[in-house]
């Protein structure tokens, strides 16, 4: 028997079947670095329209986690896709380098600043620590395959950036938005500093819940205010609080003007509460609610004088809209030091702050009874005092949501302190910010509503901190009036120039006389530092507007959905305060990573996924594919099992690509390409299918629908190509003469499809796309990442063999396959090439299928096809899912060709090749087979 293997065009490619991503990717990264890939891209896109994705800086502390990986991969996908669309899309990564966590870590090593080590040395150690953290995180981000200007990132601790942060502050001062105030702010007694809204998170906390009686001082006055007051005994207004430690600072009781209040008789006493809360107060405090002896509205009691429960202080009743019937008694004890609503309602009545609590959470020495006590430890002492004064109605433990420091995880207090604020009301800043929201595209669109709701409750932004490691608030204030120096804008620029040369120490070491001259005697340097949210919030000024490769405003900000209250908001407020315009055109948010059960990831639970581990075991491309395949608009589930499924999907895509590549063996596109109009009809369809799909894919990249791209590519590879096209052309590619038009047509189509596919996957499977690009035949003008979307020819809709035609053919093929499988299972046939198929088709379908002539058998992967009219179908013909079609399958009695394995009547008709069919004889030594359709 003759071996005809050498006459076949067997597949061959250097593109490996086994990815070995974990081993191969680091080598690829070295090559990218050696080739200076990022700069190659910049040079290739020089002068093109820009697309700026501005990187929200991660905090320089700790290894990268899965949330970091998601964020950076999404950004990288967008930047690479925009580059493929022809944009110049520089990507400058950044890091947030100041703040409390770095101070805490440095304190553990060198001790407290100003105690164990001087401030300058402490700042130096903080800078060294942050630099080390940046280096570690950078290594992790590079390993993900993220292409960025890693040699020139922005760090908020760079001298130039620190100087520009100070300049940004100067512009905000010059525009009249900075104020100094004595206001309650979130205060960390552990950190000894104020916190911004964005640094606050809510956790469950168990507190004392107490109902306290404030006695009415002048019962005659009360009697006149309450219509038809009855009953007997002293009258008290009942307040409810979960922060007993604030009672020493209590200066008023707030009621709601429109609420109805009732007086209820108790044994020997009368109590006033909101009628809507009477039942719940009764159940909680165990009081008798049966006998109502008086009614009034809140407004009737305005300025009624009450007695503080343990001080001699008189306490007025005031009115406030913040009083509701959600919980409590409808009467709210009011301490302007310890709550923004309390502060605001107190201000309207001329009630100021007392400043009883110091920065460490201790009552000051001047505070009666509680001097030196810590606010966290004083509740029981206060409760005992209330009991001794017969002012405690009820006490119990109460678990509720309470503000905590997001870094130290410790409870916060509201504390009135002298601070610097960006005023949201002065000069109408908040109104302008709200208007600017309209001009931004929010993706998903609920982001706009979230931002608006955040802004509705937006107080003045406290930007000052009492820290060592932070950009200084480089201002001079008058020692007596506390007013800013009249030449502040010019002074800020002088200080910024010094900081640009010597860093923030230039301010801390500065002798005011060097800048102020004789004025120095009247002015003090501000010693506060800036909130780190200000540092990152002004990067639109300190980075985008300072680097020539960027442009303002940015096209896109992309971060987690928690940043509506964080970076998105701080950036918007500062940009409006400085420039009057939003810093971004689009804001895109992604959800948080959760485990397979939807639970938040936690080291203590043990359900975290380490990106380093995934990359070391499965490769970065698998991690990137998981990110792309997941709808990131909501929570993103990840687990070892999910990643293993992703790895399987990756292998299927890789195998399809490899099959394409192996069929390009011996193909030189410069020499062997076939013009689109000269291609075999099925090949034209395959290229047309890719062209139409590419339009969808580019649109999905533009709308950030990456999970849809994954689905479309996966479907294209597995269904359109693997399940239809590649099955059909296998015979043509393997058995026809190497340089025949029909074979070169199939190779041309596959070459174009791979050229398109490699671009489609490059933003997502970057390492794999690079590997494919290296193995592709033909000349290349540069790396895949400098390429643009491939221009693909398309079929005209009036082409008889258009997309609709081949969809019909695919349905017929699927229907025939089901019948073949049934006959194979019942033993009628072996493989499909051992079958002869008779199709009984309606007139319309008959005409369509008949247009393929003899080549219909190659579409159906059988040795012979007979095409007949539907009304000729015998009763035992198989009914199939295609309308107007019945199928009959019989075993072929013809001999099997030793080369193509088709069973044909003409096998043995050639004396020199008795084992071959006629077309194989022609392909081996004749003029070769001719194909037009399949």
From Swiss-Prot:
Top EC class for this record: ligase
Keyword presence, Ligase: yes
Domain of life: Bacteria
InterPro entries per record: aa-tRNA-synth_I_CS (IPR001412), aa-tRNA-synth_Ia (IPR002300), Anticodon_Ile_BEm (IPR033708), Ile-tRNA-ligase (IPR002301), Ile-tRNA-ligase_type1 (IPR023585), Ile-tRNA_ligase (IPR050081), M/V/L/I-tRNA-synth_anticd-bd (IPR013155), Rossmann-like_a/b/a_fold (IPR014729)
Catalysed reactions listed for this entry: tRNA(Ile) + L-isoleucine + ATP = L-isoleucyl-tRNA(Ile) + AMP + diphosphate
Enzyme Commission number(s): 6.1.1.5
Binding positions (ATP): 603
Cofactor dependence: Zn(2+)
Binding site for L-isoleucyl-5'-AMP: 559
Family annotation (PROSITE patterns): AA_TRNA_LIGASE_I
Principal location listed in the UniProt entry: cytoplasm
Quaternary organization: Monomer.
Name this protein carries in UniProt: Isoleucine--tRNA ligase
Taxonomic source organism: Teredinibacter turnerae (strain ATCC 39867 / T7901)
């Amino acid at each position: 028997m003759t071996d005809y293997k050498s006459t076949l065009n067997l597949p061959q490619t250097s593109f490996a079947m086994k990815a070995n991503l974990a081993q191969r990717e680091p080598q690829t990264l070295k090559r990218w670095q050696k080739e200076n890939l990022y700069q190659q891209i910049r040079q290739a896109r020089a002068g093109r329209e820009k697309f700026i994705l501005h990187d929200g800086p991660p905090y320089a502390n700790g290894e990268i986690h899965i949330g970091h990986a998601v964020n950076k991969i999404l950004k990288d996908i967008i930047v690479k896709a925009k580059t493929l669309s022809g944009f110049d899309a520089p990507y400058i990564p950044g890091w947030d380098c100041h703040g409390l966590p770095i101070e805490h870590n440095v304190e553990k090593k060198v001790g407290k600043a100003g105690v164990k080590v001087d401030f300058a040395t402490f700042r130096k150690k903080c800078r060294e620590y942050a630099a080390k953290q940046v280096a570690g995180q950078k290594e992790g981000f590079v390993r993900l395959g993220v292409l960025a200007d890693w040699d020139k990132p922005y760090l908020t601790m760079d001298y130039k950036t620190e100087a520009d942060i100070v300049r940004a502050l100067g512009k905000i001062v010059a525009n009249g938005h900075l104020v100094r105030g004595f206001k309650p702010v979130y205060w960390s007694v552990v950190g000894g500093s104020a916190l911004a809204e964005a640094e606050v998170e809510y956790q469950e906390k168990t507190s004392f819940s107490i109902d306290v009686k404030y006695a009415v001082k002048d019962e005659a006055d009360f009697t006149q205010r309450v219509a038809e007051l009855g009953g007997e005994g002293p009258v008290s207004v009942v307040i409810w609080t979960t922060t007993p430690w604030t009672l020493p600072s209590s200066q008023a009781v707030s009621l709601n003007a429109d609420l109805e209040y009732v007086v209820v008789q108790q044994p020997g006493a009368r109590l006033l509460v909101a009628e809507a809360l009477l039942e719940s107060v009764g159940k909680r405090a165990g009081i008798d609610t049966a006998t109502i002896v008086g009614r009034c509205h809140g407004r009737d009691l305005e300025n009624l004088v009450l007695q503080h429960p343990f001080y001699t202080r008189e306490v007025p009743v005031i009115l406030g809209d913040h009083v509701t019937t959600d919980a409590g008694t409808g009467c709210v004890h009011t301490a302007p030091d310890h709550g923004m609503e309390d502060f605001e309602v107190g201000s309207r009545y001329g009630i100021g702050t007392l400043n009883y609590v110091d920065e460490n959470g201790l009552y000051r020495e001047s505070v009666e009874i509680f001097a030196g006590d810590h606010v966290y430890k004083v509740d029981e002492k206060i409760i005992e005092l209330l009991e001794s004064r017969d002012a405690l109605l009820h006490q119990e433990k109460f678990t509720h949501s309470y503000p905590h420091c997001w870094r130290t995880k410790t409870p916060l207090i509201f504390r009135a302190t002298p601070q610097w604020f960006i005023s949201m009301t002065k000069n109408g800043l908040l109104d302008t910010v709200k208007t600017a929201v309209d001009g931004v595209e929010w993706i998903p669109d609920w982001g706009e509503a979230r931002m608006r709701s955040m802004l509705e409750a937006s107080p003045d932004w406290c930007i000052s901190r009492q820290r060592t490691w932070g950009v200084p608030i480089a201002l001079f204030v008058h020692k007596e009036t506390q007013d800013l120096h009249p030449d502040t804008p010019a002074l800020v620029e002088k200080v910024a120039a010094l900081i640009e040369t010597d860093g923030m120490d230039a301010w801390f070491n500065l002798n005011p006389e060097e800048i102020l001259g004789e004025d120095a005697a009247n002015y003090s340097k501000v010693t506060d530092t800036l909130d780190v949210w200000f540092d990152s919030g002004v990067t639109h000024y300190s980075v985008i507007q300072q680097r020539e490769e960027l442009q303002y405003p940015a096209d896109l900000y992309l971060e987690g959905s928690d940043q509506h209250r964080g970076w998105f908001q701080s950036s918007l407020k500062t940009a409006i305060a400085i420039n009057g315009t939003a810093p971004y055109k689009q804001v895109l948010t992604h959800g948080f990573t959760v485990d397979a059960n939807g639970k938040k990831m936690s080291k203590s639970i043990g359900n975290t996924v380490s990106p380093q581990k995934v990359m070391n075991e499965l490769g970065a491309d698998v991690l990137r594919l998981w990110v792309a395949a997941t709808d990131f608009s909501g929570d993103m589930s990840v687990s070892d099992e999910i990643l293993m499924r992703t790895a399987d999907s990756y292998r299927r895509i890789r195998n399809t690509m490899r099959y394409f590549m192996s069929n390009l063996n011996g193909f030189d596109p410069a020499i062997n390409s076939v013009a689109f109009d000269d291609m075999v009809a099925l090949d034209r369809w395959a290229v047309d299918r890719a062209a139409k799909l590419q339009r969808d894919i580019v649109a999905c990249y533009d709308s950030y629908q990456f999970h849809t791209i994954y689905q479309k590519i996966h479907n294209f590879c597995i269904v359109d190509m693997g399940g239809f096209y590649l099955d059909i052309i296998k015979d043509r590619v393997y058995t026809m003469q190497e340089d025949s038009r029909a074979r070169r047509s199939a190779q041309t189509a596959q070459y174009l499809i791979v050229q398109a596919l490699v671009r489609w996957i490059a933003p997502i499977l970057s390492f794999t796309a690079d590997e494919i690009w290296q193995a592709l035949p033909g000349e290349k003008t540069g790396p895949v990442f400098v390429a643009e979307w491939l221009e693909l020819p398309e079929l005209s809709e009036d082409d008889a063999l258009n997309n609709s035609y081949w969809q019909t053919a695919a349905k017929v093929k699927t229907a025939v396959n089901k019948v073949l499988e049934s006959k194979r299972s019942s033993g009628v046939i072996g493989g499909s090439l051992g079958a002869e198929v008779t199709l009984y088709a309606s007139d319309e379908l008959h005409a369509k299928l008949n247009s393929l002539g003899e080549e219909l058998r190659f579409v159906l992967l059988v040795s012979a096809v007979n095409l007949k009219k539907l009304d000729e179908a015998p009763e035992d013909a198989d009914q199939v899912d295609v309308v107007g079609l019945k199928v009959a399958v019989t075993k072929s009695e013809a001999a099997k060709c030793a080369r193509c394995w088709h069973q044909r009547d003409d096998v043995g008709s050639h004396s020199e090749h008795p084992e071959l069919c006629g077309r194989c004889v022609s392909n081996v030594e004749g003029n070769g087979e001719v194909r037009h359709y399949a």
